[in-house]
Amino acid sequence: MEMKSNYVDIFKREIFPAKVRVEKGKIASIERIDTPCDTYILPGFVDAHIHIESSMLPPSEFARLAVCHGTVATVSDPHEIANVLGIPGVGYMLDNSEMTPFKFYFGASPCVPATTFETSGATLGPDEIESLLKMPQIKYLSEVMNFPGVINGDPDMLAKIAKAKALHKRIDGHAPGLRGDELTKYIEAGIETDHEAFTYEEGLEKLQKGMKILIREGSAAKNFEALAPLIPAYPNKLMFCSDDRHPNDLAREHIDGHVRRAIAKGYDLFDVLRIASVNPVEHYGLEVGLLRVGDPADFIVVEDLKDFKVLQTVIDGEIVARGKKPLIDSVTVETPNHFHTGIKKEEDFILERCVHTEIIHALDHSLITEEEIMDLSSGKAKDVLKITVVNRYEDVKPAVAYVHGFGLKKGAIASSVAHDSHNIIAVGCSDALIAKAVNTIIGNRGGICAVTEEEIEVLSLPIAGLMSDKDGFEVANRYADLDRMVREYFTSLLSAPFMTLSFMALLVIPELKLSDKGLFDGRSFHFIDSCRR
């Protein structure tokens, strides 16, 4: 393969017309030429932290969408499927990822389950983590979500970190809002990165104390605006990530979106491209080429350096996307799963209304919630709905609480994507509709759905209740239709209602969340009653 294009050299910070020659999947030569060129060739983009499962696609199908946006590799935490299926679930992701030329690099997830206050489908202890870390496909210890455990010297958590250190593996962090002396303790334990900084000040402190910061822009958590001002001072210490990206958003853009926004804000081109490609490759030691002689031929050709419209994506010398069309074939996939709950009844979702009721306040574009106290005894409170988490691994009574912020005026929605243990989560306008939505998910053995008295609309997710076995672009369109239905027909106030719903059970991010065991205060790490006595 040989192509002529304007060569973007991130290391020497220069751009010049060049002839790039590829042989046997490697960059054989880069030769300056005098001929003017209309396009630009640069290293492919890398998502430095993503849960592939959140795209609702297995790796082989995720790759088909991602390459259209110039992504050639991901640093992937298989935390979601590990919570459902354990080590066999991680093995599923590894095996499936090998069916595509895309470069997936997986980690060992140390917080399965994320806390002891919820029911998951599996548990990964220090021995299981060690066995994963010894696998050549496992590059790092994934996000250490239990930061209170690290700070307070939890033996299990520290043992997992010690396993990673002994095997010279990188260690990822997850510490929303952690500052001061507690942050120092967390870093001293060996934690190297964080993708959970929500403010400039938080990101700056973490950088100054030695961490690397991942600027996240996902389907729910959006921190780009807050953290982008860090770029000029810390271009070598930053990476871009999406963390959780739903299929409709992945079909629209990926890391190319981060790059476009950063350039539009006037940040230095070479700094931005370093963050999008070089930094994750160097930090994690990825076998991803950076467009140097001898490197694997992983690169993209773009129309210009403003909009970054991807014309070609190349991995190991193979053209894997041209324009917005993938050149990677879909593959047939298996559908392992884990569902052991029974059909639920309307009366399973009865909950007392009281004068001082604890309410979860869901916030748009945020994983954090707020605690509210409302008088529900009169039944006049506006936009207060029931929310439930149903244990899908055992047939037990659901947990029920109240939530504010969804804005539904009709219907109910439910999902088996409920971070991080992935029980069934639902919110709705009546107990009957909530039961209908929950039972729809149970009947499909996983998925997302929107129901009314007359209608049932569902996207089935038969792979662990997390991923579809259908074409990725079809899944993206179906998800977009359901999302639009909830926003427009159900009048949800949220820009991504299913994504926000999926994080209402994530106990490690405050303030109030709901697990299958009850209402949980993520600040004190204790269960609380819905009714304040």
Curated annotation (Swiss-Prot):
Gene that encodes it: ade
Hydrolase is among the record's keywords: yes
Signal peptide positions (record): none
Protein name in UniProt: Adenine deaminase
Pfam families the UniProt entry points to: Adenine_deam_C, Amidohydro_1
InterPro entries xref list: Adenine_deam, Adenine_deam_C, Amidohydro-rel, Metal-dep_hydrolase_composite, Metal_Hydrolase
Obligatory cofactor(s): Mn(2+)
Family to which this protein belongs: Belongs to the metallo-dependent hydrolases superfamily. Adenine deaminase family.
The entry's keywords: Hydrolase, Manganese
EC number: 3.5.4.2
One annotated GO biological process: adenine catabolic process
Substrates-to-products reaction catalysed: adenine + H2O + H(+) = hypoxanthine + NH4(+)
Organism for this UniProt entry: Sulfurovum sp. (strain NBC37-1)
Residue ranges of the TM segments: none
Superkingdom: Bacteria
Record has Oxidoreductase as a keyword: no
